[in-house]
Amino acid sequence: MIKKKKKKSYTSVYALGQYISMSTHKARRVIDQIRGRSYEEALMILELMPYRGCYPIFKLVYSAAANASHNKGFKETNLVISKAEVNQGNTVKKLKPRARGRSYPIKRPTCHITIVLEDISFYQQYEEYLMYLKNPGCRNEKRNLPCYETYSSGGPWDKK
């Protein structure tokens, strides 16, 4: 089996729940509703959905946010669920005793759920910095050179 190398990310945290006794299909039905949403919105959705699989996923999202605030110092208002995936786990097999000395097998499916939260405040600051860098003549008012848009047509470098 090939293992993926995890890149060290400075803006994301994750929580992993393993061997949760739930079918992967039922867990994916809930996970698809919260993927890409903000942390607070996801908690509200999970509290109001009527499925049994919401509670373990709610605990995982809450745990990932606690990891973000405790380990990296992120604010919970800036967190977004960037990645949420459900993988199939082991199937727990039991025997149910029946009449006349017989037994029926019972299969309990399990799943592994991974929730990744990202801090979007870093990206907003990065976009502001890029906007600041796009107009190089405008950031120094001491210069006497005119400020041209770098991507506009009709600038001094467009002439042949």
Swiss-Prot record:
GO terms for cellular component: chloroplast; large ribosomal subunit. GO terms for biological process: translation. Part of the 50S ribosomal subunit. It comes from Aethionema grandiflorum (Persian stone-cress). GO terms for molecular function: rRNA binding; structural constituent of ribosome. Gene3D superfamilies: Ribosomal protein L22/L17 (3.90.470.10). It comes from the Eukaryota. The keyword Secreted does not apply. This protein binds specifically to 23S rRNA. Belongs to the universal ribosomal protein uL22 family. This is Large ribosomal subunit protein uL22c. It is found in: Plastid, Chloroplast. Keywords: Chloroplast, Plastid, Ribonucleoprotein, Ribosomal protein, RNA-binding, rRNA-binding. Disulfide bonds: none annotated. PROSITE patterns: RIBOSOMAL_L22.
